[in-house]
């Protein structure tokens, strides 16, 4: 972390909060945690700047942090069993407020071993609890910093559509700006309009977002073109090449994709639709099945991913998840490749391809844009599906053409842009009309 930041620099805006006052508040909370001998707290903050302050306080006091993905009953129980209390915006306003102000701001140790427990949402199966340390998170943030083309400086405002409760949000929305000296936008902005509005809070802005949101950007919006936008960072899935290139060309802003996971942290980056470049602290290779393994400075051991890849000297090309490379007949079909091809169709806003829950065939769950909905209504379902299959046959084997189709206006992706298996299965098992 940048311990030498100007004390009058800002940590956030609207309202402004100076770095010196931010550190003082962190010291007060740390002192209170030590006084009460608190071993573990769970976080649930709306304000990311308050989250950052409470996080530094916990690092300084050695208090474990629990990050639930949501506050559903099972996570409430997890918090009750493993944390002394839930730390939120309301509690922050008065917790430790009576503690004395330190004469000198503390030096925050980037080698600190305080634990962060991240609980996954379980969207792809059983929820997992992953343990990180403060040292590992700082190391990862430094590697991210070295991989990005953006400068340090207090004039840059980091605006985000992702939650701080997940690893992606924690790394990029909290840890990275603390290293870079950027200001942290307080509120998560899940829609393009909010990101645009918040971007005007500072001389320059950088967005942390996802392919799902970036595909919804209206590149003809005059206000978007007026944004003091330096660039965007996208993760949580593959950004369609035409979308990324259109943003780069029309907004004259860098669009950087990050590849990684909660288990591995950041792995690699790319600034176009080409090969992935691992961080300077990351080594990669392939196992016997052709799936990528990762060994980074912040990992306790080598992590095996489920993503197929091809290596090209010090870079690599992703082929899609091994479990999403399925054999239909005698052909190996990449479900991710079908998605990428289908996303190029002018009617398609979003899509997810998986094996049908009953029949051994690809099934396509497709969100249509306005042109797509209009064409669906004009052509009728059968002719509409035929057109999409005809489009795909240019790039796909016949066995890779989806046999089953469901059409909606929006896919129910979670905050990490993932589709849950139960949602997908329900869409194809339920006998109902397309939701258009």
Regions found by a protein language model. Name each.
Residues 326, 353, 388-436:
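Conserved C-terminal "lid"/linker of ANL adenylate-forming enzymes
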Residues 31-71, 155-164, 332:
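Conserved AMP-binding/adenylate-forming
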Residues 2-6, 101-119, 151-159:
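Conserved pre-ATP/AMP-binding loop-to-beta segment of ANL
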Residues 306-400:
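AMP-binding/adenylate-forming catalytic core of the ANL superfamily
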Residues 219-274:
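Gly/Ser/Thr-rich phosphate-binding loop
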Residues 18, 107, 115-142:
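Conserved AMP-binding A3 loop
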Residues 4-35, 90, 132-135:
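Conserved AMP-binding/adenylate-forming core of the ANL superfamily
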Residues 142-157, 165-206:
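Conserved AMP-binding/adenylation subdomain of ANL enzymes
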